[in-house]
């Protein structure tokens, strides 16, 4: 998972060529439990780092998920809209949520590495 960056609000980000893929972490999906609904943003939406991107709803709770960086939504994962359990089964691949074209790519540097994120989780427990 060295290709991933993380937030303290349990989102992950993977850099691709000209966009980034965003989802919620395995830790977050474990805490939430079985997903039953995912609300995604619209393609073309402009978001700022930390702004709400959408909602994931599980049998336990509904939780907002946030933009790890500023950018424009270029794609949403329609598959998780139809089958929210993908977020539980494969949060880092098939269960991705949104793709963004970064407006300030330097914001990625401020995100957590896998090791930093694991330390953050350990402190929460």
Swiss-Prot record:
Cofactor(s) essential for the protein: (R)-lipoate
PROSITE patterns xref list: BIOTINYL_LIPOYL (PS50968), LIPOYL (PS00189)
Superkingdom field: Bacteria
InterPro entries given in the database record: 2-oxoA_DH_lipoyl-BS, Biotin_lipoyl, GCV_H, GCV_H/Fam206, GCV_H_sub, Single_hybrid_motif
Pfam families membership: GCV_H
Cofactor note: Binds 1 lipoyl cofactor covalently.
Cellular component, GO annotation: cytosol; glycine cleavage complex
Modified residues (N6-lipoyllysine): 60
Membrane-traversing stretches: none
Domain Lipoyl-binding: from-to ranges: 19-101
This protein's UniProt keywords: Lipoyl
Biological processes per GO annotation: glycine decarboxylation via glycine cleavage system
HAMAP family referenced in this protein's UniProt entry, alphabetically: GcvH
Functional note: The glycine cleavage system catalyzes the degradation of glycine. The H protein shuttles the methylamine group of glycine from the P protein to the T protein.
Family: Belongs to the GcvH family.
PANTHER family in UniProt: GLYCINE CLEAVAGE SYSTEM H PROTEIN, GLYCINE CLEAVAGE SYSTEM H PROTEIN-RELATED
Assembly mode: The glycine cleavage system is composed of four proteins: P, T, L and H.
Record protein name field: Glycine cleavage system H protein
Naturally occurring in which organism (per UniProt): Legionella pneumophila subsp. pneumophila (strain Philadelphia 1 / ATCC 33152 / DSM 7513)
Encoding gene (name): gcvH
